[in-house]
Amino acid sequence: MGNNLMQTDLSVWGMYQHADIVVKCVMIGLILASVVTWAIFFSKSVEFFNQKRRLKREQQLLAEARSLNQANDIAADFGSKSLSLHLLNEAQNELELSEGSDDNEGIKERTSFRLERRVAAVGRQMGRGNGYLATIGAISPFVGLFGTVWGIMNSFIGIAQTQTTNLAVVAPGIAEALLATAIGLVAAIPAVVIYNVFARQIGGFKAMLGDVAAQVLLLQSRDLDLEASAAAHPVRVAQKLRAG
């Protein structure tokens, strides 16, 4: 019996080669799922790092702005893909659409809604790929378990056909079956961990973008209030300007 066990190739590759076609398909599918997981991890990690660093730099520059026009001048150098520039454009577009309106509170409310929608859209865009991670993490163990059950069934069939319980006959089939479960766990565990890490990063990034949106809304609100004050007290404002 010992010689038979030694002659049986119980390496990972050997067990794969001797596995049933169904178990092989399960293993290949799980390996492909693992490859997808790590591809998403590396691509999204680079994306998160670049976007976060860029947004942080833009936020620091916009903190020096004292009006919406000044912020637009600063953001002109950010590039067309700048998220901060998109937020400023939303505020500017609402001002242009509401030109002639005296309802400053309505303008602020509509701008706030626009900015919230933009932040939510960015969050959805940053979350692309997380659905695959969640699916892989949820179903991989069960797919591996299916391969294990199928392999054990084949082992029992082999026992019945050979009419022996010799360990040399039983062990290889069971080992091949358990390999499917192991690969399923190898695919699922990183997917779940990476999904949770990305979920936290997306939440943090949306918070940073929300701070920029609040800064844009603050600048717009200040501009509207100053314009309203200038219209209500033109003489006082003119005196202050001359005094300055």
UniProtKB/Swiss-Prot annotation:
Keywords: Bacteriocin transport, Cell inner membrane, Cell membrane, Membrane, Protein transport, Transmembrane, Transmembrane helix, Transport. It is a multi-pass membrane protein. Residues 1-15, 156-161 are periplasmic. One of its GO terms (biological process) is protein import. It is found in: Cell inner membrane. The accessory proteins ExbB and ExbD seem to form a complex with TonB. Belongs to the ExbB/TolQ family. Involved in the TonB-dependent energy-dependent transport of various receptor-bound substrates. Protects ExbD from proteolytic degradation and functionally stabilizes TonB. This is Biopolymer transport protein ExbB. It comes from Escherichia coli (strain K12).
